[in-house]
Amino acid sequence: YPMIPLSSLFTNAVLRAQYLHQLAADIYKDFERTYMPNEQRHSSKNSPSAFCYSETIPAPTGKDEAQQRSDVELLQFSLALIQSWISPLQSLSRVFTNSLVFLTSDRVFEKLKDLEEGIVALMRDLGEGGFGSSTLLKLTYDKFDVNLRNDDALFKNYGLLSCFKKDMHKVETYLKVMKCRRFVESNCTL
Protein backbone atom coordinates (compact mmCIF):
# COMPACT_ATOMS: atom_id res chain seq x y z
CA TYR A 1 0.00 0.00 0.00
CA PRO A 2 1.34 3.44 -0.84
CA MET A 3 1.90 5.74 2.10
CA ILE A 4 -0.68 8.49 2.26
CA PRO A 5 0.81 11.82 3.38
CA LEU A 6 -0.27 12.89 6.86
CA SER A 7 -1.69 16.13 5.47
CA SER A 8 -3.99 14.13 3.16
CA LEU A 9 -5.13 11.91 6.03
CA PHE A 10 -6.03 15.01 8.06
CA THR A 11 -7.75 16.66 5.09
CA ASN A 12 -9.84 13.55 4.43
CA ALA A 13 -10.74 13.16 8.10
CA VAL A 14 -11.78 16.82 8.40
CA LEU A 15 -13.91 16.59 5.24
CA ARG A 16 -15.65 13.45 6.51
CA ALA A 17 -16.25 15.02 9.92
CA GLN A 18 -17.67 18.19 8.32
CA TYR A 19 -19.94 16.08 6.13
CA LEU A 20 -21.16 14.01 9.09
CA HIS A 21 -21.76 17.09 11.23
CA GLN A 22 -23.79 18.72 8.43
CA LEU A 23 -25.73 15.50 7.83
CA ALA A 24 -26.43 15.17 11.57
CA ALA A 25 -27.70 18.77 11.65
CA ASP A 26 -29.92 18.16 8.59
CA ILE A 27 -31.36 14.94 10.03
CA TYR A 28 -32.01 16.67 13.36
CA LYS A 29 -33.83 19.57 11.64
CA ASP A 30 -35.83 17.19 9.45
CA PHE A 31 -36.87 15.12 12.47
CA GLU A 32 -37.78 18.27 14.39
CA ARG A 33 -39.93 19.61 11.53
CA THR A 34 -41.62 16.27 10.94
CA TYR A 35 -42.24 14.96 14.45
CA MET A 36 -41.85 17.69 17.08
CA PRO A 37 -44.48 20.39 17.58
CA ASN A 38 -43.02 23.79 18.48
CA GLU A 39 -44.12 23.68 22.12
CA GLN A 40 -42.44 20.29 22.64
CA ARG A 41 -39.13 21.38 21.13
CA HIS A 42 -38.30 23.70 23.99
CA SER A 43 -39.39 21.38 26.80
CA SER A 44 -37.45 18.44 25.36
CA LYS A 45 -34.16 20.35 25.37
CA ASN A 46 -34.26 20.28 29.17
CA SER A 47 -35.39 16.67 29.49
CA PRO A 48 -33.13 13.83 30.66
CA SER A 49 -33.25 12.34 27.15
CA ALA A 50 -31.22 15.35 25.99
CA PHE A 51 -28.29 14.19 28.17
CA CYS A 52 -25.37 12.99 26.06
CA TYR A 53 -22.97 10.25 27.21
CA SER A 54 -20.13 12.26 25.73
CA GLU A 55 -20.66 14.79 28.52
CA THR A 56 -19.29 12.16 30.95
CA ILE A 57 -15.81 12.05 29.41
CA PRO A 58 -13.21 14.74 30.06
CA ALA A 59 -13.23 15.86 26.43
CA PRO A 60 -12.72 19.52 25.52
CA THR A 61 -15.97 21.38 24.94
CA GLY A 62 -14.73 23.96 22.47
CA LYS A 63 -11.83 24.92 20.24
CA ASP A 64 -10.01 26.85 22.99
CA GLU A 65 -10.02 23.81 25.27
CA ALA A 66 -9.14 21.54 22.34
CA GLN A 67 -6.05 23.64 21.60
CA GLN A 68 -4.78 22.81 25.11
CA ARG A 69 -4.85 19.04 24.41
CA SER A 70 -2.37 16.89 22.54
CA ASP A 71 -3.17 15.49 19.11
CA VAL A 72 -3.16 11.97 20.53
CA GLU A 73 -5.75 12.94 23.17
CA LEU A 74 -7.95 14.62 20.56
CA LEU A 75 -7.75 11.56 18.31
CA GLN A 76 -8.66 9.31 21.24
CA PHE A 77 -11.66 11.49 22.11
CA SER A 78 -12.72 11.54 18.45
CA LEU A 79 -12.46 7.78 18.12
CA ALA A 80 -14.40 7.21 21.34
CA LEU A 81 -17.20 9.53 20.18
CA ILE A 82 -17.42 7.87 16.77
CA GLN A 83 -17.42 4.35 18.19
CA SER A 84 -20.21 5.24 20.61
CA TRP A 85 -22.47 5.89 17.59
CA ILE A 86 -21.68 2.92 15.36
CA SER A 87 -24.21 0.53 16.88
CA PRO A 88 -27.12 3.00 17.25
CA LEU A 89 -26.74 4.29 13.71
CA GLN A 90 -27.08 0.81 12.24
CA SER A 91 -30.78 0.94 13.14
CA LEU A 92 -31.43 4.50 11.98
CA SER A 93 -32.85 3.59 8.56
CA ARG A 94 -35.43 1.25 10.14
CA VAL A 95 -36.76 4.05 12.31
CA PHE A 96 -37.41 6.74 9.75
CA THR A 97 -39.11 5.97 6.47
CA ASN A 98 -40.29 8.43 3.82
CA SER A 99 -38.01 11.27 4.85
CA LEU A 100 -34.59 12.82 4.42
CA VAL A 101 -33.49 10.80 7.43
CA PHE A 102 -34.31 7.53 5.69
CA LEU A 103 -32.56 8.53 2.48
CA THR A 104 -29.35 9.54 4.24
CA SER A 105 -29.17 7.11 7.17
CA ASP A 106 -27.24 4.37 5.38
CA ARG A 107 -24.73 6.95 4.18
CA VAL A 108 -24.32 8.21 7.74
CA PHE A 109 -23.29 4.75 8.93
CA GLU A 110 -20.87 4.27 6.01
CA LYS A 111 -19.31 7.71 6.52
CA LEU A 112 -18.98 7.07 10.25
CA LYS A 113 -17.11 3.82 9.54
CA ASP A 114 -14.90 5.67 7.01
CA LEU A 115 -14.11 8.35 9.58
CA GLU A 116 -13.32 5.69 12.18
CA GLU A 117 -10.83 4.11 9.74
CA GLY A 118 -9.32 7.53 9.01
CA ILE A 119 -8.80 8.29 12.68
CA VAL A 120 -7.27 4.86 13.28
CA ALA A 121 -4.88 5.57 10.36
CA LEU A 122 -3.97 8.96 11.86
CA MET A 123 -3.33 7.34 15.24
CA ARG A 124 -1.14 4.72 13.59
CA ASP A 125 0.82 7.38 11.66
CA LEU A 126 1.28 9.48 14.79
CA GLY A 127 2.59 6.44 16.65
CA GLU A 128 -0.45 5.98 18.86
CA GLY A 129 -1.20 2.35 18.08
CA GLY A 130 -2.38 1.58 21.60
CA PHE A 131 -5.88 2.88 20.93
CA GLY A 132 -6.40 3.93 24.54
CA SER A 133 -9.77 5.41 23.64
CA SER A 134 -11.66 2.29 24.66
CA THR A 135 -11.28 3.37 28.28
CA LEU A 136 -12.73 6.83 27.62
CA LEU A 137 -16.27 6.01 26.60
CA LYS A 138 -17.28 2.41 27.06
CA LEU A 139 -20.93 3.36 26.87
CA THR A 140 -22.62 3.38 23.54
CA TYR A 141 -25.82 5.23 22.88
CA ASP A 142 -29.14 3.39 22.91
CA LYS A 143 -30.59 2.29 19.64
CA PHE A 144 -33.18 4.56 18.07
CA ASP A 145 -36.77 3.67 18.99
CA VAL A 146 -38.87 2.38 16.10
CA ASN A 147 -42.23 3.27 17.67
CA LEU A 148 -42.75 6.87 16.55
CA ARG A 149 -46.36 7.00 17.75
CA ASN A 150 -45.18 7.10 21.32
CA ASP A 151 -44.14 10.44 22.89
CA ASP A 152 -41.37 8.83 24.93
CA ALA A 153 -39.90 7.29 21.78
CA LEU A 154 -40.08 10.63 19.97
CA PHE A 155 -38.28 12.42 22.80
CA LYS A 156 -35.67 9.67 23.03
CA ASN A 157 -34.93 9.83 19.29
CA TYR A 158 -34.92 13.63 19.37
CA GLY A 159 -32.41 13.55 22.23
CA LEU A 160 -30.24 10.98 20.43
CA LEU A 161 -30.19 13.07 17.25
CA SER A 162 -29.27 16.14 19.30
CA CYS A 163 -26.37 14.24 20.91
CA PHE A 164 -25.22 12.89 17.55
CA LYS A 165 -25.13 16.42 16.15
CA LYS A 166 -23.18 17.73 19.19
CA ASP A 167 -20.72 14.84 19.11
CA MET A 168 -20.02 15.20 15.39
CA HIS A 169 -19.41 18.92 15.95
CA LYS A 170 -16.84 18.03 18.62
CA VAL A 171 -15.08 15.56 16.32
CA GLU A 172 -15.02 18.13 13.52
CA THR A 173 -13.57 20.76 15.88
CA TYR A 174 -10.88 18.42 17.24
CA LEU A 175 -9.75 17.38 13.76
CA LYS A 176 -9.65 20.98 12.52
CA VAL A 177 -7.60 22.05 15.55
CA MET A 178 -5.08 19.27 14.89
CA LYS A 179 -4.88 19.98 11.17
CA CYS A 180 -4.37 23.72 11.71
CA ARG A 181 -1.74 23.08 14.36
CA ARG A 182 0.26 20.74 12.13
CA PHE A 183 -0.17 22.34 8.73
CA VAL A 184 -0.02 26.10 8.65
CA GLU A 185 -2.45 27.20 5.99
CA SER A 186 -3.54 30.69 5.08
CA ASN A 187 -7.21 29.65 5.12
CA CYS A 188 -7.06 27.84 8.44
CA THR A 189 -10.12 29.04 10.31
CA LEU A 190 -11.94 27.31 13.11
UniProtKB/Swiss-Prot annotation:
It comes from the Eukaryota. InterPro entries: 4_helix_cytokine-like_core, Somatotropin, Somatotropin/Prolactin, Somatotropin_CS. GO terms for cellular component: extracellular space. Disulfide bonds join C52-C163, C180-C188. Its main location: secreted. The keyword Nucleotide-binding does not apply. One of its GO terms (biological process) is positive regulation of receptor signaling pathway via JAK-STAT. Belongs to the somatotropin/prolactin family. This is Somatotropin-1. It comes from Acipenser gueldenstaedtii (Russian sturgeon). The gene is gh1.
